[in-house]
């Protein structure tokens, strides 16, 4: 225990001493109110002051710095510390309260005689703290025990020693100085605003309805922290039973409770003891349970009535109807109940006959000699190597699997024994000498070759699926739907058209002939008076073989002519070429305009544009056209601009066409345009007959285009004729 607690406990006991008549009053009356308790707590403080004044002259050795506890402050703090003391005090039992009150009355009676003893003991030195604690511990069980204490107990002596250690209370000097400074005024005013919902009056009506509804609101859990005492448990159990007259023990318990409350009110301000653990409380409560309380409780209960015995004759056995098990046949359990679509059909041959089940081949029992031969095959190296030749070729990359392959080749039926023997042989190869192995191999006989070893493994599973050839749609004409069949080409009358005649291809032309035809423009023959008909044919051949665009007018010199013999050969080749070509027949549909076979649904509507006719010109702009007609200068022509003006050399080239140089001629010679009118007309006709020239749709535009082509083709034809 702390020394402060040791000091506080005896002080409270001393206060209880001189007020014994008050305790007797409590036995007769009910518990008094709080103001009466306060008045009682102030009286012992006055007595304590008188005692301390008597002890003062005898105390010389104590220093002034000792802790002092004024009685005034103790009396003020007493009502505040009631709650603390009640929680820390041990709940007393019913029996222990009676002797306590008696002992306290005796202590209070002997309190007067204890005062001179305190003065005598003050001269001696104060006892040690350890002694005080021992005295206090010995005093606590004295309170709980109902034994009668002596005239002057150890508690009184401890209190006397404790009082001697206390000094006088310090006198507090009141400050009488007056404030002479300026007056302090607080202009700020505070207004109290009550919070919403702090009281029930401030709650809105809608929220009150929600609070009244207790649906879904979990209530607070019951307080299980407070253990019920034996008296509370007895009262709770006996509340259901009604008694005619209350027992004498009930009156005593009420008086004891009133005295306990009065004692707690007086000693609450000073006692600060720790509460005992729960285990000790339970033990004390169990000890305090007496036989008298149990007897009183059992007396309130009535006698137990005996239960009537049951007669076995009155019991009747109930007969349950026995359920009969009926076996219901399920669908598919018998072959008759299986639908015909789902019945298993027996396997049949191609002819439709059912196949007979194959007889299982039973393995022949091996004799002891055969078993020994099979087991000893792995030890014979010569036989093992012969059979190992094939698998070793496959497993050259994996050397670790060679002994297993040997074991597979040697063993035919007993795979397990062979595998064990192969592992044993592979491990014992390095340990067993060669002589022993050879001696063992000589004792073994030779194994006959099995004819089935070299045969490939056949699959025993026979598949029922058969391949059926089905004709695909469109594979034959009969399988093609009538909508998708190809229709024969027919005339307008509905007659089938005859097959088109295949045109005979032109004879293959040699490279020499093509080169001569292409280089004809660069060379001039000796005989310039060649017939016009041959030139026309040659131009047609060249235009068909080579591209239809005119050759560029290059100023490259032709190959030098060695002799007149070459000219004769060229003439002969041209004559042969012209003879091979027949006369061209005129096509009646040649000059007809080309018609579009695609018929467009969109019709082109001709709309007059603004200014296309005189009627569509606005009146504001008509005077401009009138001025131009009268002779006002219009827009300058494109040819008059300096940008588009051509040089005199270019104009001269346009006017006079040039002919290529020949070996006989040293310079370019100008050929007049109207030198050979017949030859030029033939050339223009041949140019117009070429397939590249497209006839325009409009007739007026076609005439203009033909005129322009004739003008451009005239100078080119003149140049070719001269060559």
From Swiss-Prot:
Region feature (Disordered): 1-402, 422-509, 547-723
Cross-link (Glycyl lysine isopeptide (Lys-Gly) (interchain with G-Cter in SUMO2)): 32
Ranges of Acidic residues composition bias in the record: 157-173
Molecular-function annotations in GO: calcium-dependent cysteine-type endopeptidase inhibitor activity
Composition skew (Polar residues), residue ranges: 653-670
Residue ranges with Basic residues bias: 21-30
Entry-annotated residues carrying Phosphoserine: 87, 224, 245, 367, 369, 376, 443, 519, 530, 578, 580
Annotated InterPro entries: Calpastatin (IPR026998), Prot_inh_calpain (IPR001259)
Positions annotated as Inhibitory domain repeat: 171-224, 307-359, 449-502, 586-642
Comp. bias regions, Basic and acidic residues: 46-84, 195-216, 249-263, 306-367, 378-396, 445-504, 562-571, 586-643, 701-723
Modified residues (N6-acetyllysine): 50
Cellular component annotations (GO), alphabetically ordered: cytoplasm
Domain of life assignment: Eukaryota
Disulfide bonds: none
Family: Belongs to the protease inhibitor I27 (calpastatin) family.
Function: Specific inhibition of calpain (calcium-dependent cysteine protease). Plays a key role in postmortem tenderization of meat and have been proposed to be involved in muscle protein degradation in living tissue.
The protein, known as: Calpastatin
Gene source species: Ovis aries
Organism lineage: Eukaryota, Metazoa, Chordata, Craniata, Vertebrata
Protein's gene: CAST
């Amino acid at each position: 225990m702390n020394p402060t607690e040791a000091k506080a406990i005896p002080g409270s006991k001393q206060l209880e001493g001189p007020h014994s008549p008050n305790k007797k009053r409590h036995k007769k009356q009910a518990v008094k109110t709080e103001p009466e308790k306060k008045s009682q707590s102030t009286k012992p403080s006055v007595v304590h002051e008188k005692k301390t004044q008597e002890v003062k002259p005898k105390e010389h050795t104590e220093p002034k710095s000792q802790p002092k506890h004024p009685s005034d402050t103790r009396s003020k703090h007493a009502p505040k510390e009631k709650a603390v003391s009640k929680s820390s005090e041990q709940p007393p039992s019913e029996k222990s309260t009676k002797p306590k009150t008696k002992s306290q009355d005796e202590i209070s009676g002997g309190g007067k005689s204890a005062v001179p003893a305190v003065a005598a003991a003050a001269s001696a030195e104060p006892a040690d703290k350890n002694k005080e604690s021992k005295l206090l511990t010995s005093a606590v069980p004295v309170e709980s025990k109902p034994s009668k204490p002596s005239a002057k107990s150890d508690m009184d002596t401890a209190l006397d020693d404790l009082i001697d250690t206390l000094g006088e209370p310090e006198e507090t000097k009141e400050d009488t100085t007056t404030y002479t400074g300026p007056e302090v005024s607080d202009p700020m005013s505070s207004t109290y605003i009550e919070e919403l919902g702090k009281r029930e009056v401030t709650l809105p009506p809608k929220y009150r309805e929600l609070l009244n509804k207790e649906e879904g609101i979990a209530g607070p859990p019951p307080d299980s922290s407070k253990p019920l005492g034996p008296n509370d448990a007895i009262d709770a159990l006996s509340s259901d039973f009604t008694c005619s007259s209350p027992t004498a023990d009930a009156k005593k318990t009420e008086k004891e409770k009133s005295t306990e409350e009065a004692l707690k009110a007086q000693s609450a301000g000073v006692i600060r003891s720790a509460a005992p653990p729960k285990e000790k409380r339970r033990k004390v409560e169990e000890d305090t349970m007496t036989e008298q309380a149990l007897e009183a409780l059992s007396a309130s209960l009535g006698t137990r009535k005996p239960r009537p015995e049951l007669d076995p004759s009155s019991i009747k056995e109930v007969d349950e109807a026995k359920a009969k098990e009926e076996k219901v046949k399920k669908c598919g359990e018998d072959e008759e109940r299986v639908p015909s679509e789902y019945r298993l059909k027996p396997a049949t041959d191609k002819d439709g006959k059912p196949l007979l089940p194959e007889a299982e081949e039973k393995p022949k029992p091996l004799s002891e000699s055969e078993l020994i031969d099979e087991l000893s095959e792995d030890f014979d190296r010569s036989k093992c190597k012969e059979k190992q030749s094939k698998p070793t070729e496959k497993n050259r990359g994996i050397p670790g699997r060679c002994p297993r392959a040997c074991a597979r080749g040697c063993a035919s039926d007993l795979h397990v024994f062979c595998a064990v023997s192969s592992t044993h042989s592979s491990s014992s190869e390095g340990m067993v000498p060669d002589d022993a192995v050879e001696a063992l191999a000589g004792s073994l006989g030779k194994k006959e070759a099995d004819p089935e070893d070299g045969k490939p493994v056949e699959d025993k599973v026979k598949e029922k699926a058969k391949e059926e050839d089905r004709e695909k749609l469109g594979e034959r004409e009969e399988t093609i739907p009538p909508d998708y069949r190809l229709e024969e080409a027919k005339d307008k009358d509905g007659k089938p058209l005859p097959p088109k005649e295949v045109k005979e291809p032109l004879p293959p032309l040699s490279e020499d002939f093509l080169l001569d035809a292409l280089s004809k423009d660069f060379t001039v023959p000796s005989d310039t008076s060649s017939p016009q008909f041959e030139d026309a044919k040659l131009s047609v051949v060249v235009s068909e073989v080579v591209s239809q665009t005119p050759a560029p007018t290059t100023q490259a010199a032709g190959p030098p002519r060695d002799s007149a013999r070459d000219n004769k050969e060229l003439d002969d080749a041209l004559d042969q070429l012209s003879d091979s070509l027949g006369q061209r027949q005129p096509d009646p549909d040649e000059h007809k305009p080309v018609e579009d076979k695609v018929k467009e649904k969109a019709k082109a509507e001709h709309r007059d544009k603004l200014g296309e006719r005189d009627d569509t010109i606005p009146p504001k702009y008509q005077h401009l056209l009138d001025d131009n007609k009268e002779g006002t200068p219009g827009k300058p022509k494109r040819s008059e601009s300096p940008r588009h003006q051509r040089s005199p050399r270019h104009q001269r080239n346009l006017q006079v066409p040039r002919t290529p140089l020949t070996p006989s001629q040293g310079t370019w010679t100008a050929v007049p345009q109207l030198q050979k009118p017949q030859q030029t007309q033939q050339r223009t006709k041949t140019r117009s007959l070429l397939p590249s020239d497209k006839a325009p749709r409009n007739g007026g535009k076609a005439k203009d285009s033909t005129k322009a082509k004739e003008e451009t083709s005239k100078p080119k034809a003149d140049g070719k004729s001269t060559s």
